[in-house]
Amino acid sequence: MKVVVNERRCFGSGQCVLVAPEVFEQSNDGTVTLLVDKPSPDNHSLVRAAARSCPATAIRFEENAMRQEPTEFSYDDLPALISRMRGDERHSFSSSSTMDVLWVLYDEIPNVSPESPDDDDRDRFLLSKGHGPMAYYAVLAAKGFLRPELLDTWATKNSPLGFAPDRTKISGVEMSGGSLGHGLPLAVGVAMGLRIQNRHAPRVFVLIGDGEFDEGSNHEAMAFAGRARLNQLTVIVLDNGTASMGWPHGIDKRFDGEGWDTININGADHEEIAAALNRDHNDRPLAVVATVTRQSARSSIQQR
């Protein structure tokens, strides 16, 4: 039996709001199970609400319920996975142009797995590019971080897959996104935190769009990371020529001027992407500027 619970929260002002309904499962022995990917205080309170609404004798959490067993998905399967997500906010070009970098990252580079997404020594990946979640969700599904059938629920009521990723709902997601210009500053903070904790093995990757450089927060983070020599940090910039402020000398020159190691690559070439991300950048942060076009993104899908 499934129990749907609406919980009303009241605040000091006397204002009450209705929290979105959650679905629970109740077994024959009366146990109420809330299928969650990450436990939180909200989950606990909702389970208690479910217990009050049915004759439950026990409450338990089933964590990582959205996760699936390791899969045999390949890069060739990504277009089909992306096509399962439908709606007016698909941002198809952004998804296709982001797909190659995301795939290489998760296929060859990061030290992170669905079995240990919260390991203290894991590599971290932050998606800052606001129009890239569909490709991100597809790659996470292909790599076992979430069940492929969840892609069919994208952007629907109660789906964990929103227009922007939510780190409280999806295993392996390090950053709740949506607002441009936040990814690089957050990644700088993560890299600095790892240094303070004397954790020097984990790497921090952040994917941003060139249009995000219209946000001043990125320039501040860029300057600080260069001065602090945060060599655990790698920034991938997808350059599709949409930055309204313009880059007459190239994005890489801006990073280079702040003390970063930089490299320019073809954002649809998997070998170039892998080589750049594995580049030895000694005691400096690394900026990988990946040029992408509508044609290269379209060809990348058609050729694989």
From Swiss-Prot:
<protein>
    <recommendedName>
        <fullName>Ferredoxin fas2</fullName>
    </recommendedName>
</protein>
<feature type="domain" description="4Fe-4S ferredoxin-type">
    <location>
        <begin position="2"/>
        <end position="29"/>
    </location>
</feature>
<comment type="function">
    <text>Plays a role in electron transfer. The fas operon encodes genes involved in cytokinin production and in host plant fasciation (leafy gall).</text>
</comment>
<dbReference type="InterPro" id="IPR017896">
    <property type="entry name" value="4Fe4S_Fe-S-bd"/>
</dbReference>
<keyword id="KW-0813">Transport</keyword>
<keyword id="KW-0249">Electron transport</keyword>
<dbReference type="GO" id="GO:0000287">
    <property type="term" value="F:magnesium ion binding"/>
</dbReference>
<keyword id="KW-0003">3Fe-4S</keyword>
<dbReference type="InterPro" id="IPR005474">
    <property type="entry name" value="Transketolase_N"/>
</dbReference>
<feature type="binding site">
    <location>
        <position position="10"/>
    </location>
    <ligand>
        <name>[3Fe-4S] cluster</name>
    </ligand>
</feature>
<dbReference type="InterPro" id="IPR029061">
    <property type="entry name" value="THDP-binding"/>
</dbReference>
<dbReference type="GO" id="GO:0051538">
    <property type="term" value="F:3 iron, 4 sulfur cluster binding"/>
</dbReference>
<keyword id="KW-0411">Iron-sulfur</keyword>
<keyword id="KW-0408">Iron</keyword>
<comment type="similarity">
    <text>In the C-terminal section; belongs to the transketolase family.</text>
</comment>
<feature type="binding site">
    <location>
        <position position="54"/>
    </location>
    <ligand>
        <name>[3Fe-4S] cluster</name>
    </ligand>
</feature>
<keyword id="KW-0614">Plasmid</keyword>
<feature type="binding site">
    <location>
        <position position="16"/>
    </location>
    <ligand>
        <name>[3Fe-4S] cluster</name>
    </ligand>
</feature>
<feature type="region of interest" description="Transketolase-like">
    <location>
        <begin position="66"/>
        <end position="304"/>
    </location>
</feature>
<dbReference type="Pfam" id="PF13370">
    <property type="entry name" value="Fer4_13"/>
</dbReference>
<keyword id="KW-0479">Metal-binding</keyword>
<dbReference type="Pfam" id="PF00456">
    <property type="entry name" value="Transketolase_N"/>
</dbReference>
